Amino acid sequence: TSSAGPPIDEKPYWTVSSTGQTCYQAIRNLSTQSPRIIFWGHNRLTLLGENMAKSGVSEVLDLLQRNHEVRSSMDVMSVRNASIDEVMATMFELERQPVKGFFGLLWSIQRRNSTSFPQSVLELSRKIETEGMEPVIPSVEVVNRSDEETAAPGQLREEVVMDSVRINGMAAFKEDKLVGWLADRESRGVLWVLGKAQRGILVIRDPRDDNNLISIRIGASSSKIVPEIVDDRPVIRVVVEAEGDPLEIDGDASFLHHPEIWASMERRMAAVIRNEIQMALTAGQQQFQSDIFGFGRAFYSKYPHEWQLIKDNWDNIFPTLEVQLDIIANLKEPGLTVEGVRQAQ
């Protein structure tokens, strides 16, 4: 006898697409291909195609929020350099269902690298509608993997490696339109400003020898955006406090209890954070001209009257806005683990 059920290599999901003159029509046209009624309450993730994101996402967001079945907490991502079909055709090595793979990536990136963070449909919609603030959402791209041939003793074996996906930085918007892509370090620079950088690794050079590298594990961090008016012009001061602890050290580690070297490491850590924020500022102010940091919103909160005078001209003010950075880095004591393995030998 044989047990009923699908073959072990059969996909546990079905990919289907439809078209229409409007989003609602395209959704209704799905009924011509699906024998079952689609329940949108099960939807956990929305992927935005690059071309559609560049033309504007308001119609899609409006559709999602008007549908009483759709969860406003559903995550949203933007696809880069690929079509939705190409993304849906990829495989996750350790997950049979793509949606579990996407959520695994989001969890890992947020808690391990701080180069991206989840955004829901509701959060994206609110940032689009909020004055003085532009949204950023995770960026997804396809990782191309060529077919491989591997030889085993006495035989030839062909191994087909499917394409996969990865979260690579973030997508920057201006109003409801995609305007560009942030690389990993630029994305973390945005997260430093927003106070969302909680995990990841910073690499600094050893104060004793620039040829040696030290890995710093990012701990807790916080930020404060302080708007000021100096000589009748707006100025932003960003204060970032970050904790870290040395995780990997090239060479002798006995210097960790030397106060002057410890202070030098903290200065170098602060310099790396400053550099990442500067990279993000350059992208936001010069490349995209999009206030992805919410500086305008900070001015509105502190100076509501003055904001009414400058808000219509904010798009011209923001690219040349002076931003002052105050970075405070604190390294935790290494505890009992001081001597490295090589030194102990």
Residue spans for each PLM region:
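Membrane-proximal alpha-helical signals and transmembrane carboxylates
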Residues: T1-Q345
